[in-house]
């Protein structure tokens, strides 16, 4: 009698495991990020504003800045472009640390230092490393040179599992184990500041209240906070475009000429081809990072219009996003979703026609650049030493740095403390950029 491959006892034992749904990864959502920011704001308010309760029933008519600042911090968080393109990691202090855990081959590869050992999970896996030791050569998919190019004699090698006779000798001097290990490397992110100042006369305050019924304090507060946020958005857009690598599959040196590099009789056909171009370059981001394909698009208004006119852009989600405060009419704007699922944002100040692709994963740890807000808003109030005119200032503190796998080179000594932010031109594989010529 032959032994059953699967018995009823096996089924009873493992069926609950098979039927149990895997728990979904809970990312650090935009709501959680905003909660951390408001907590930082509340802690700063308590330590620095110096607002105390007035005696008795006077409390009900005394205006305070604490709820105003918290409300401003809540309002600013959703319209920050970093929430859509960057990983967001709020700081709980002026300095923070980010870590990169790198898996590497062991000493068996002949290297003498940890940082010189070949890194795992970054390129194609060496199919012979844990097996028969065959050195990989040829095409990574297994095709010969003749099959790909039509001629040639190069044949692709295939690493296989080792035979039992070799496996029985693992650990001996003639047949050592293939070894792997890890290195943990760290970098720092330091909060930097922005600040604006304004003063006004008592006469202006009195006249604005008497004639227009407006509080100058509130008006100037909105002006300064909105300007700071607008400047931050422009910093993030410029940083993203500065550090993105250039298109690799289309165009020349990151410049795509619609008239020469894209085939099509009519402008509409060429505009439709833009989506395929985006898809190919987005796949390239996935190959370079091993994290995922590009899923965000930042482009000039005319490029977005070309995609819309070709029927590739669905504008319906814009109305839904309005209710989630995902649209910033004074900075970047959410335009819609492409037919391949990419979310499209418009750079309203763009002069050159361009497209920048970005990858952002499901969690705040999975992105090419990290935005690290510390104190959303710091407010200072005083009076002129001779004029006694009211003065007001706002500051914000935040840090920005590249993903540690980008800013820490593969051959960096694990014992060396990295203090640079990793923002360098044409260096971040989580982003790809291309200039578009002859769009119309």
Swiss-Prot record:
> Is NADP a UniProt keyword of this protein?
no
Swiss-Prot/TrEMBL keywords: Capsid protein, Late protein, Virion
Alphabetical GO CC annotations of the entry are: viral capsid
Q: Does the keyword Ribonucleoprotein apply?
A: no
Pfam families named in the record? Gp23
**InterPro entries per the record?**
Gp23/Gp24_T4-like (IPR010762)
Task: Name the predominant localization.
Answer: virion
Location relative to the cell: Virion
Briefly, what is this protein's role?
Major capsid protein that self-associates to form the icosahedral capsid.
Similarity comment: Belongs to the T4 phage major capsid protein family.
Stated name of the protein: Major capsid protein
What organism does the UniProt record list as the source?
Salmonella phage ViI
